[in-house]
């Protein structure tokens, strides 16, 4: 085995074969970092046949003017069941970054620690407890089992829907009542989904602005999304949910015709048997349904007059590799939330994953706080409703490469606080 620099193709070919690689460890992210002017390295291990058997993208930024801080975001990509390979890689990685005047190195492997449900109850251990002792023996310090959202540390909890051996109907059956109801609702309410082009990304950004204002969270800059769309190429999809009013109004009119037939039948039943309570109740219920239907028709006609035949209502930003669909971000028009466009977006992408044989549908980060007072309690409830599971990852590890200067660096940081 030998530690070596990799070409972009070698790196991409390998990471696309590994079933547990994160989108930050793919060629598109390397191209993005290079375009942004970030010092970037592609390194890995090759076996005696010159085949890549481990890889990672490393970035480096200046610290204390003359040193560098190296980071492998969700790396390395490696078979963590091969303990000998893991030991060799991390040992060689330290030697490599030392040659580039590294002050300290951070890694946060895309490696599950344990599995939980959305009540926070542990349902299983991933079998990777040994990694903590292994990395400690190599001089890496674990940063702890933190919860919540941190500007430096990667989120440690993901909400993931396992799609292995499941049909779309299976997924629908396993949803809770609200998710199931809204998914069926958008299917019959004229809500359509298409993918946005690069030029149309401002539509997505407008929804993100609406959502960030309503839910009071700080969103990324426009450039974050635009640059990833550009450099990740086909690995980013931005589905847009919109209403086609011609189709929606036609569906509502068809629904009204059925309701009118049922209503007339109820009237005839009452005429035949005035004491028939069941027929009277049915008549009242149908009157309510007809009233609601007419309100929807009126709303649809008014909105069509205001916006034209198509009205965008929700969009999402998804990042894809051969083994995972990641729901990175999404936003909805506050004014038209009642059309449940976000459910159409999720349903479209769940079906995309199933059709492309992708077994992991990642709703992405949650805080790890499963209490009702959690800052993301509503988000947790939404993701739980799809019958997703929670994966807790091992977390961050730091290795000081130049120990004396690293200690000075930490002291200076504390003084600045």
Curated annotation (Swiss-Prot):
Keyword set, alphabetical order: Acyltransferase, Cell shape, Cell wall biogenesis/degradation, Cytoplasm, Peptidoglycan synthesis, Transferase
Top EC category: transferase
GO cellular component: cytoplasm
Cellular localisation: Cytoplasm
One family name in Pfam for this protein: FemAB
Gene Ontology BP, a term: cell wall organization
Catalytic activity: beta-D-GlcNAc-(1->4)-Mur2Ac(oyl-L-Ala-D-isoglutaminyl-L-Lys-(N(6)-Gly)-D-Ala-D-Ala)-di-trans,octa-cis-undecaprenyl diphosphate + 2 glycyl-tRNA(Gly) = MurNAc-L-Ala-D-isoglutaminyl-L-Lys-(N(6)-tri-Gly)-D-Ala-D-Ala-diphospho-di-trans,octa-cis-undecaprenyl-GlcNAc + 2 tRNA(Gly) + 2 H(+)
Protein EC: 2.3.2.17
InterPro entries: Acyl_CoA_acyltransferase, FEMABX, PG_Glycine_Bridge_Synth, tRNA-bd_arm
Gene Ontology MF, one: nucleotide binding
SUPFAM superfamilies: Acyl-CoA N-acyltransferases (Nat) (SSF55729), tRNA-binding arm (SSF46589)
Main location: cytoplasm
Coiled-coil segments: none
Family statement: Belongs to the FemABX family.
Main function: Catalyzes the incorporation of amino acid(s) into the interchain peptide bridge of peptidoglycan, using aminoacyl-tRNA as amino acid donor.
Name of this protein: Aminoacyltransferase FemA
